[in-house]
Regions:
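A composition-driven surface/loop motif
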Residues: 1-170
Length: 170
């Protein structure tokens, strides 16, 4: 439950859900039930919650890494993990408001704002995102589903650190 949280971090995602239960599907469909899966976030009525994050961490599969001639930068590699959202879940994430849906979640991110590796469902609350890249990103290739059932979303993307999609589900 977010109840007046004020979290800032410059060396990792400001909020990260790493070990959470995942739903029993590995295919994208119109009716993926994420209600009991992943991180379940509740934005408490009448509260303002501030989340600020700016860090991008990439962990590569060692056998795929190709370095430049000076051996100082990665030129090509397949990612094992990439943590680049200010508010991030390694699995699915559900965001809910309480009865009045009057709670506010403000996310400021140098890169991705609200980021889920699997499915993301927004059911309520007032969510304001300002990001340098994607405002909302779900990114498990061919599997991720982004669903907005309720609430109010305001997304401002600067494009400072990427192409800058409002909502990117890839």
């Amino acid at each position: 439950i977010l109840n007046g949280a004020d979290i800032s971090c410059s060396v990792a995602p400001a909020v990260i859900f790493y070990n959470v239960y995942e739903c029993a599907t590995d295919e994208a469909t119109n009716d993926v039930d994420t209600s009991a899966a992943g991180a379940n976030v509740i934005i408490a009525d009448g509260t303002v919650n501030e989340i600020n994050g700016s860090y991008v961490e990439k962990i590569y599969k060692p056998e795929t890494v190709v370095l430049n001639d000076e051996k100082t930068e990665v030129e090509d590699a397949k990612k094992l993990h990439k943590y680049d959202g200010a508010f991030y879940s390694k699995m699915s994430m559900n965001i809910n408001g309480e009865k009045e849906n009057s709670g506010v979640l403000n996310i400021a991110a140098a890169n991705e704002g609200l980021d889920s590796e699997m499915h993301l469902t927004v059911n309520g609350g007032i969510i304001n995102i300002k990001s340098g890249n994607d405002g909302i990103n779900t990114n498990e290739d061919g599997v991720s589903v982004t669903t907005v059932n309720g609430g109010k979303l305001t997304i401002k993307v600067t494009g400072d650190t990427g192409e800058g999609d409002g909502i990117d589900s890839n």
